[in-house]
Amino acid sequence: MASLIYRQLLGNSYAVDLSDETQEIGASRNQNVTVNPGPFAQTNYAPVSWGPGEVRDSTTVEPLLDGPYQPTTFNPPVDYWMLLAPTDRGVVVEGTNNTNRWLAIILVEPDVPTEERTYTLFGQQAQITVANDSQLKWKFIVVSKQTLDGAYAQYGPLLSATKLYAVMKHSGRIYTYSGETPNATTAYYSTTNYDTVNMKAYCHFYIIPRTQESKCTEYINTGLPPIQNTRNVIPVSITSRDIQYTRAQVNEDILISKASLWKEMQYNRDIIIRFQIANSIVKSGGLGYKWSEISFKPANYQYSYIRDDEEVTSATTCSVNGVNEFSYSGGSLPTDFAVSKYEVIKENSFVYVDYWDDSQAFRNMVYVRSLAANLNSVMCTGGDFSFALPVGHYPVMTGGAVTLHSAGVTLSTQFTDFVSLNSLRFRFSLSVEEPPFSIIRTRVSGLYGLPATKPNNSQEYYEIAGRFSLISLVPSNDDYQTPIMNSVTVRQDLERQLSELRDEFNSLSQQIAMSQLIDLALLPLDMFSMFSGIKSTIDAAKSMVTNVMKKFKKSSLANSVSTLTNSLSDAASSVSRSSSIRSIGSTASAWTDVSITASDVSTATNSIATQTSTISKRLRLKEMATQTDGMNFDDISAEMLKTKIDKSTQITADTLPEMITEASEKFIPNRTYRIINNDEVFETSIDGKYFAYRVDTFEEIPFDVQKFADLVTDSPVISAIIDFKTLKKLNDNYGITKEQAFNLLRSDPKVLREFINQNNPIIKNRIENLIMQCRL
């Protein structure tokens, strides 16, 4: 039988683990190898000395604590704290806008009774009454007046054990600190023309950006880091902040080393990455209430931007990996809204963006080292997608958000319609963000991640700014370009090939002769006969079989086998613990998931549909375990796959694992299975439809779900190649004997061939329908 190929792939999956283990052992071993490159013209090895190179950044990193600076008069920048560190009592700092605000800070030592002191403020003598009741802490006092000749008033004192104070200009105000350490907080004074206020500091001070205000508060309450209190820290003039430091250029081409034929070039580039996240939405047939698949797919995007006064043409390809599959079913009725599968990317997912531009850096990107990149993060939010139903209110999938964080960069290859491009692949890890996504008018709500329904949220693209640096081995002659095929590090992107191959496979369905299909489906098909039609198979047969099994191991069919094995083990354990007849019979739940309560007479129709649908999804495995002489769906599926592989002009050893795995999951999605009990037949489909009828009259009888569940354990499962509706139509129009009916029920290939050779339109239409379901 042709379905032997699927059983072999399932039975030999252990070889995948062995292969992976062997590769891991080989990768973990280190071996020193000395290579003698020989004459330069007769070797592919680089005749250069691989130096460490350098990675320079165009981004200025602002220090957290800038200073200390010498006492001076200057206009502090807005949104920067001026952290003052006086060593003795007296005036600490004073500032004015020369209009309506004169403000100064005075420091008073501990344990000072109320007394009047004379201070020089803004060039004039002023009598200020001060006091400090604290025995240990110093006291900062804010004195302020609103006219040049006005009297000073005192505000917001700060009792400090650290002897530190801070002021800042921000949003039309002058901010200070008040209270008592270690619980000091900020206070402010409204000031016009606040940005023109000059400060005169009488002590050493530091500058801290407002973005680090929490750190400034920490210093005020707990003191400066110990390193700032050593004699080696020497204050400098504030004018040192005005020194123009040389920053890295937006475009840099640096010569690292050079020989007669080769040279090492370091390329540093500021880049802007724009990308789109594409999706595919497939609606099921029928009345228009079902969607079969909503998934992500790779997307190419071409754009241009200005870099260093030069227009750069760029191209990106965005793809995702590690998607999470969700589904929703509103019920079993044809008019119930349902989505069989929709994909969501979450924390366990990755987004890949392949980037290329027309600069010199990408011209010879073949032998590369010291590859590094720094990129910003970007948030991707989901938009609203309405499921257009024929009647009723539309369900709407809305919300969902993730943030992309840079997680690495490698070399890759982008495939466009006309050319292959060496490019950089930027890998992004994900973190989920608010809001969660939901499907309005359904029970789906509060789920986190980004669904594939509308990942761009009406935006044309997402944008990330960053910089990359690499050292590339290039020919010394700038006019020569290293051939792209020499690269051994690029990743061959198969998605474009697979898309074309799927289209070819689907078009080949119409070229397969129905009369030959049954004969070919009965032939034993093993792995090597399956691969015999592919070029260069003999040389790569072993590795190709391993690759096929490695991919097949992750298929839904293989996962179902693993789940079923665990269920059977649990069921066997329950039998050993209890000797009752009911417990032994309950082992059927391993195949069916039907509980003991399923025998309740009052079981609702919807409940039966759900149970029979659950059973049907596992009957494929049961049929594989109890092979009969009849033909089954997997025989047709495997033979269709084999025939299409032989006829295909695009299949390769790289795309074969994908095609076999997809075919095992997607060929003939609408399957119906039956169990024969004397003259009664039980028939169920994976979409929840069920029939029970007598063979002699084809009259329906009540469907006993518990009896059906019990029969699953002991009776062979048969693929309903000719389903109940087709049988009834055949009997009503042509009339068939009881023997013919039994043979068709058992999917006897001889009887099927006879009806096809007689050009029976009903049987031919059913087989043609199965052939057309063999699509990707």
UniProtKB/Swiss-Prot annotation:
A motif (YGL motif) lies at residues 448-450. GO terms for cellular component: host cell endoplasmic reticulum-Golgi intermediate compartment; host cell plasma membrane; host cell rough endoplasmic reticulum; host cytoskeleton; membrane; viral outer capsid. Residues 248-479 are annotated as: Spike body and stalk (antigen domain). The record marks 231-232, 241-242, 247-248 as: Cleavage. It holds the Pfam family VP4_helical. InterPro entries: ConA-like_dom_sf, Rota_A_VP4, Rota_VP4_MID, Rota_VP4_MID_sf, VP4_concanavalin-like, VP4_helical. Residues 389-409 are annotated as: Hydrophobic. Keywords: Capsid protein, Coiled coil, Disulfide bond, Hemagglutinin, Host cell membrane, Host cytoplasm, Host cytoskeleton, Host endoplasmic reticulum, Host membrane, Host-virus interaction, Membrane, Outer capsid protein, Viral attachment to host cell, Viral penetration into host cytoplasm, Viral penetration via permeabilization of host membrane, Virion, Virus entry into host cell. The record marks 101, 190 as: Binding to sialic acid. Residues 65-224 are annotated as: Spike head. It comes from the Viruses. A motif (KID motif) lies at residues 644-646. GO terms for biological process: permeabilization of host organelle membrane involved in viral entry into host cell; virion attachment to host cell. Residues 484-511 form a coiled coil. Belongs to the rotavirus VP4 family. This is Outer capsid protein VP4. It comes from Rotavirus A (isolate RVA/Equine/United Kingdom/L338/1988/G13P12[18]).
